[in-house]
Amino acid sequence: MSDNLKIGLQYLTPKHALTRLAGKLASAKMGWLTTAVIKWFIKQYNVNMDEAKNPDPEAYSTFNNFFVRELEDGARPINEDDSVISHPADACVSQFGPIMDGKLVQAKGHVYSAQELLGGDEALAAEFMGGEFATLYLSPSDYHRVHMPCDATLRKMIYVPGDLFSVNPLTAENVPNLFARNERVVCIFDTEFGPMAQILVGATIVGSIETTWAETVTPPTGPAVKTWHYPLSGDDMICFKKGEEMGRFKLGSTVINLFAPNSIKFDDSMENGTPTRMGTPFAHIVK
């Protein structure tokens, strides 16, 4: 099948209906059939089960339980240097660099608006103007829990409704404004080095996006942007330490981080197309 045909089919496919169906099947307990699908998936995508807390495919009652499997303690050591920002996920670096004129690079020849990505919030987008961004793509074989890259306090969460295109490299190179048009959950944190956004982007077959504080954010989907504000003082603050889990995909997709200007410098290991491991150096705080 040609690349043009693959892209064209995505425009025609009823992506929300397909994703709802996939979500229901992935959460269904189907006994031997579930186990057979899990074993096929492990073989097809070369999933490393040796690092899973429970490596037995038959131990997972649903495909979703397998997909968001925990790792063994110590499988992803967190860099303990306070000046180091760690990778939030096992993924592949899609793009990274400066936010120039309020735009992020999606792929060669494609840029999109930070304001659109953040649900149209002009004031929020201004906090990241001239800052840095990184886009991380989680493939089917990756560990699909998302962690905190640094110590932070949750300020705001925004649900932005949208489409559900695939987010693989082919689609990123061919669908304009992909990440600003797909459904997403925007999480805004305050850190010692300024504001940080960690954005969980949905895609075709991504049955749900969850956070540790709100549990399932989507589905159900909705027609309007929704915003939740969280206290920045007192007993009800939601605070995280570097390396703590903050969310997960069922099934996997993309994480985008935004950083304020003059706050971080990406690690020298960062390069488009390279794999990442949660907990390893992502960037360094500029002091």
Curated annotation (Swiss-Prot):
It catalyses: a 1,2-diacyl-sn-glycero-3-phospho-L-serine + H(+) = a 1,2-diacyl-sn-glycero-3-phosphoethanolamine + CO2. It comes from the Bacteria. The record marks 252-253 as: Cleavage (non-hydrolytic). Its cofactor is pyruvate. Signal peptide: none annotated. One of its GO terms (molecular function) is phosphatidylserine decarboxylase activity. InterPro entries: PS_Dcarbxylase, PSD-B, PSD_type1_pro. This is Phosphatidylserine decarboxylase proenzyme. It comes from Aliivibrio fischeri (strain ATCC 700601 / ES114).
